Amino acid sequence: MRLIIDTDTAGDDTYSMLLAMKTPGSTLEAVTVCVGNVPFDQQVENALATIEVAGFSGKIPVYCGARRPMVKPWEPSTMHGNDGMSGANLPIARQRPETLHAVDAIIEKVMAAPGEIDILAQAPLTNIALAVMKEPRIAKAVRHLWIMGGTDNSVGNITPCAEYNFFIDPEAARIVFEAGFNITLSTWTLTMRSSLFEADQLEEIFAMQTPLSEFYRKVSAVPRQTAEARYGRPISTHPDSLTCAIALNPDLIESARDAVVRIETMGEITRGFSAVHPPVLGNRWPDFKVNARVVEVASNDGFFWMMKQAFS
Ligand code: BDR
Ligand code: CA
């Protein structure tokens, strides 16, 4: 599979990149950085450092994209520490970012190989929305768009109604869901259901003592502490890397449904909420077209196995 990852590189974004670099059959063709978790230039350094740690320095270009959301001001995520890497203090990578803008890189790569490139969008959707506004043909030329964001009509992680990626740029999310892409959506609801590693799984990874399992141990430290305070046990959550694992191996999906996904852009309390509903609502409403497949349950065992393979 030929893949572009659009990322706000921090914590779990980096394990997703490791999966894409290390899983046989996957070619990570480019990384595009988007506004999100931590200050923009730090995210670029985190992406470059991750590529270097994985042994792919100079082989995967990194492009800089949108530095702020479309309408509302940027807000950092507090999940991953100030540097997004739990203070792991990785050396500055030798590779430097490209000069071409991420939006143009996405358009160029997709239009050069229509129907061949998948995009994994694991950040606010600003870059993808700007790309499809500039070149609407990419909606049909991207083979598949795998999105991590929103909830399945459930509780979010940044507000009770919203997940971070859609909350930060709901206008961009709305544009992307209305653009005609072939979308699979992996939500925060799925994250809490299928992506968690419990204490025994974490011990198994730490016991591997490989350079990449050590990278995982260090970079996941702050989110694990936050999760322990919030959920009462030392779990680790993997919204982005589960989405990547599903993209690389859709057999992980145990249950999914076709749905209409609409993003709330105006609600005072519900801004960034993803309404996930069937195409026909009743006679007060027009019929809506299905615009995404929403993953409900994925195999935690299969995901855990893929992560261990990537770290080995
Ligand atoms: C998403 O937001 C970010 O904090 C994570 O990187 C992930 O993409 C989870 O809400
Ligand atoms: Ca992310």
What are these regions (language model features)?
Residues 72-75, 157-158, 195-198:
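Short, well-ordered secondary-structure micro-motifs
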Residues 62, 176, 244:
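A residue-level signal for conserved active-site and pocket-lining positions in enzyme catalytic cores
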Residues 1-49, 57, 89-193:
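Active-site histidine-anchored catalytic micro-motif
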